Amino acid sequence: ELDDGTVITESVAICRYFEEIQPQPPLFGTGALGKARVEEWQRRMELNLLMAVAHAFRHIHPAMKEWEVPQIAEWGEANKPKALDFLALLDRELANREFAAGDSYSIADITGMVAIDFMKPARIAVPEELANVRRWHGAIAARPSAKA
C-alpha cells in the first residue's frame, strides 16, 4: 500500500512501479534489445518455470488441499518434468552469461530465483549436473537484496 492508500497487488506491477520511482539500477533492461530480452526471459521464467513449480506445489503439498480444490496429484507430478526441462534449457543459456537475460541483473533473475527456491516445498530437486543453474542461483541468492 502506498502512502496515498493506493494498493498494487501484482509482483511485476510492483517492480515496474519501483523502477519508475527509482530507475537505477534498471530491473527491466535498457535500450530496445535489452528491454526485449528482459521481457522475454521474465516471461520464460514465469510461464515455463514458476508456473510448473506452482502447479506441482499446489497439487501435491498437503498444506494446499484446502486451496486447490480439487487437488490432483497426477497434475502436480506432470508439472515436475516441465520445470526440469526448462532448467536444462536455462543451464545451457547460462553457460554464456552471468544473468538470465544478459549482462545485467533483472526481474528475470528475481523470478527465476523465487521459482527455484520454491522447488524445495514443491518436492522438485535441482539436478546436480545443472552446474550453470546452480552457480547462477547461488550468486543471485547471495545478493543483499535477496536476503531482504
Question: How would you describe each model-predicted region?
Answer:
Residues 1-77, 81, 91, 98:
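GST-like domain detector, emphasizing the conserved glutathione-binding G-site
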Residues 61-65, 119-127:
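Short helix-capping/linker segments at secondary-structure and domain boundaries
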Residues 129-147:
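C-terminal end-helix/capping segment
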Residues 53, 100-124, 134, 139-140:
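GST superfamily/GST-like fold recognition
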